[in-house]
């Protein structure tokens, strides 16, 4: 896949004064309960990060509710955020693909990230693992071994992704093209079903978020052949990077970020950004992210907007190069 700047240069958070201070002495940014929508079910990686963030920015509002709205590839909360309340009480935490990739793979997407949303901050960076299940014999220990096995077993050569037109889908396409091998793509609705079918021997391989498969890798039920990040995962130090394995086509990470509706007052956006950045400075917050192989990463709203623009351009070129036809 085309290379890009994976990590964000941090700058100091914008200060915010003029907080709403209720009689209890709490310094809440908004004087009503807030809601963070997430487009994936409970137990998913975005859900984990959303709930963790809600716990650590609890002084932002009297209470913060996590609203799971799974389905449609994670797009439902973004559809609901468009034109939503602009008082800081409505937010969405989403992976970057729903914002920067989906405009190029869906013909009738109901939102425009640069027009309809106000970016607040990234929260973390997410890496994937290229893993194989028990259908692949134990002597397959590297990506090169897997490619050789695919050539010898074309009917079994398959990989799962969280859905058609997702980043892991394109990672698999990139790997197959660079290696000159055919692999059947099997789309799923998220990472956990991929792992279930890997364990059951229904598919040979998968590209999944580390946290979805980590317990099974550690238990030896599935084997991780490469991580997609530029550096090895600290929690799996023996797993090589895709580049180390000789297949940079598999390289790539994704951000999770927080948004509010376009038109939300700048002082509220700045205050929420400050609350997120404060959480990202807490050792306990960083430790809990690291335990699931998420890398804490914040930025200013302006930096986040620029990242989205860069990703939109990168994915436009990538999707075009793959000849992918936009879906309805």
Residue ranges and their predicted role:
Residues 83-89, 104-193, 255-288:
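Hinge/capping helix and adjacent helix->loop/strand transition within the periplasmic-binding protein
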